[in-house]
A protein has these predicted regions:
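Short, solvent-exposed loop/turn segments enriched in Ser/Thr/Gly
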Residues: 35-40, 101-102, 115-118
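A surface/secretory-pathway sequence property marking extracellular, secreted
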Residues: 60-87, 143-149
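Bacterial N-terminal signal peptides
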Residues: 9-17
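Bacterial N-terminal signal peptides that target proteins for export
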Residues: 1-10
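Extracytoplasmic/periplasmic copper-protein system
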Residues: 34, 123-152
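Sec/Tat signal peptide C-region and signal peptidase I cleavage site
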Residues: 18-23
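Low-complexity, serine/threonine/proline/glycine-rich extracellular segments that form mucin-like
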Residues: 30-68
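Low-complexity, intrinsically disordered segments enriched in Ser/Thr together with acidic residues
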Residues: 94-114
Length: 152
């Protein structure tokens, strides 16, 4: 009986861990060629019991985002720096509880191999927010993409 309880507790912990790991904003693909063009997809889940209505993104330095995939019912407000480069965006719409959406972006990667970090804040209709800006392994990690060197 004790063995069964330990197994049940271990299984419950594993399910909770997997569930929480999937609740994060993600960027796909997680690997891309340095200097290459890429279609990035931001996957946004809503595991709260209230609507999520805004996602604010800050793009990695050196990444040149140049187009956004339209999403029915959502608007995209683009933020630019002094040079006119797109440095972030705000998506506004309705993401109902326990649903997810994917938002596409076209970009040119920085030339240098290494990691680039995206930062997102997800806002909810009850006034709360989740900031996906933490280090890997934190409760709310920022999505990271590894840029691989290309041999030419």
């Amino acid at each position: 009986m004790v063995k069964l309880s330990i197994r049940a507790a271990a299984l419950a912990a594993l399910v909770a861990l997997i569930g929480s790991a999937q609740a994060h904003i993600r960027i796909n693909p997680t690997e891309s060629p340095a200097g290459g063009r890429e279609m990035y997809r931001m996957r946004v889940p809503n595991e709260k019991q209230v609507n999520s209505s805004r996602i604010v993104g800050e793009f990695p330095a050196g990444l040149k985002v140049y187009a956004f995939e339209p999403k029915a019912g959502w608007t995209v407000d683009i933020r630019r720096n002094d040079k006119g480069d797109i440095v972030g965006a705000t998506w506004n719409g309705v993401l109902k509880p326990y649903e997810f959406l994917e938002f596409g972006m076209l970009a040119i990667n920085p030339e240098a191999a290494g990691e680039i970090t995206w930062k997102f804040v997800q806002y909810y209709d009850d006034g709360t927010k989740e900031e996906f800006v933490g280090a890997a392994g934190s409760r709310l990690p920022a999505p990271v993409v590894t840029l691989k060197a290309v041999t030419r």
